[in-house]
Design a protein with these regions (language model features):
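Membrane-interface loop-to-helix entry segments
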Residues: 18-39, 153-159, 165-214, 219, ...
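Alpha-helical membrane segments and immediately flanking helix-loop junctions
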Residues: 49-80, 113-119, 140, 240-287
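Transmembrane helix-loop junctions in multi-pass membrane proteins
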Residues: 14, 30-34, 69-74, 83, ...
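Membrane-interface alpha-helices at helix entry/exit sites of multi-pass transporters
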Residues: 49-54, 82-89, 120-124, 129-135, ...
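Helix-loop-helix module between adjacent transmembrane segments
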Residues: 22-27, 92-112, 119, 123-153, ...
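N-terminal alpha-helical transmembrane segments of multi-pass membrane transport
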Residues: 1-68, 78-84, 96, 213, ...
């Protein structure tokens, strides 16, 4: 399949090396900034600037990241790369924390009313507006794929497992709900995320912890398998250790979006424009999304399922209610991701179109979300992976070349 070949080319060793190398360089230059995250957050102060509150900003950014990647993406990583993929998701998150810190520091330094996120630091910091335009183009395409179609496609598939419904009718409803929400701008998006995300995250966390507690005796073997398969220490795992790395990094990035450049666009809406504050909160988001939530998902699956199914794992706790519960969680996480990614796509489209035709983009974006209810999930996932990778290249290049500006 042509899409699969393109995907394998984009996500080859070159991009994985670039992600890890850039994250490692920033980690070294900033003296392991990841471990100072709590102190940076607690010493941040309220700003008098207009914009989203810090809590709304974090909910919007975290909601954008916490979509299907935390549930279906983690299950997919385990199915394709084995337990070893979990280790490489941790590695991607550790270096990803450094990446998002650098992204947000640079964005806060260079952003203005017209330029936001990577478009700002690639244009004003690096002096390369062409690279900023390329990034914006890939971001628009990623928003239409990963940001909308993938999320709704996965939710629609899960919904069909527990209810008989008309996909075309669902598409119409999705179009209306998404369109009406995103038309309200960052304030309405932030309010929706602030209302939905905390309760959904708390419920999902409690259920996963309960599943893990029920099967607690399996944890030592699970952790042993994670490290053994990550490095191919067992003969049976030797053939998949390299693939576990690739899948783990890819699914980790799909979940936390570190290195893609979406985080600084979202944080540019915050009232507090302190580079250090936005960098610290963005690190927390990657930690919570991947180190915490994806690990809980992986542990629950490895403890309670033989076929890498989140619903099957949760059934040991919720019984027949497991499928409706996971479907509801997917629905909330997916919706938060869709409305958050609209903001990224809209700002990128505005950069390309010089602020024109935003209404047209809004309608097209809502339509792409609606199409997710009827399109084949495999092709949508492949396209999303491709645009994720293409979006990362210009952003990572900018981070490497501006790394000394992060230190100042």
């Amino acid at each position: 399949m042509i899409l699969e070949k393109i995907n394998n080319f984009v996500w080859g060793k070159g991009l994985i090396f670039l992600l890890l190398f850039t994250g490692a360089m920033i980690t070294y230059k900033l003296k392991f900034i990841q471990f100072r995250m709590p102190f940076l957050i607690f010493r941040s102060r309220k700003s008098e600037n207009s914009g989203l509150s810090q809590f709304k900003t974090v909910c919007m950014s975290l909601g954008t990241a916490m979509g299907t990647g935390n549930i279906v993406g983690t299950a997919s990583a385990l199915a394709l790369g084995g337990a070893g993929a979990v280790f490489w998701m941790w590695i991607s998150a550790f270096f990803g924390m450094a990446l998002v810190y650098a992204e947000n520091v640079l964005s806060a330094k260079y952003s203005d009313e017209a330029l936001k996120g990577p478009m700002a630091y690639l244009t004003k910091g690096l002096g390369c507006p062409v690279l900023a335009w390329i990034f914006a183009l890939f971001c628009v395409m990623a928003s239409l794929g990963m940001g909308s179609m993938v999320q709704i496609s996965t939710f629609a598939d899960s919904l069909q497992d527990c209810a008989d419904f008309s996909r075309p009718l669902a598409a119409v409803i999705i179009f209306a709900v998404v369109f009406l929400t995103v038309r309200g701008g960052s304030q309405r998006i932030g309010t929706a995320a602030q209302f939905l995300l905390p309760a959904a995250s708390a419920a999902y966390t409690l259920v996963c912890i309960a599943v893990i507690a029920i099967h607690g005796e399996k944890l030592p073997d699970i952790f042993s398998n994670i490290f053994a398969e990550a490095f191919g220490l067992r003969e049976a795992a030797g053939g998949i250790s390299g693939y576990a790395l690739s899948v783990g990094i890819r699914r980790g990035i799909f979940s936390n979006e570190a290195g893609l450049g979406s985080s600084p666009i979202l944080h540019s809406a915050a009232e507090n424009t302190s580079p250090e504050t936005q960098g610290a909160w963005s690190m927390f988001e990657v930690f919570f999304d991947t180190i915490f939530c994806c690990t809980l998902t992986a542990m629950a699956i490895l403890c309670g399922s033989d076929c890498f199914s989140v619903s099957e794992a949760v059934s040991s706790m919720l019984g027949g209610f497991s499928v409706p519960f996971i479907t509801a969680e997917l629905g909330i996480f997916s919706f938060c991701t869709v409305i958050g990614w609209y903001y990224c796509g809209m700002k990128s489209f505005s950069h390309i179109s010089k602020g024109k035709y935003i209404g047209i983009f809004t309608a097209v974006y809502a339509l792409s979300a609606a199409c997710g209810a009827v399109f084949s999930p495999e092709s949508v996932w492949l396209l999303s992976d491709i645009f994720n990778g293409l979006m990362a290249f210009p952003n990572l290049l900018g981070l490497l070349l501006l790394i000394n500006q992060v230190k100042k």
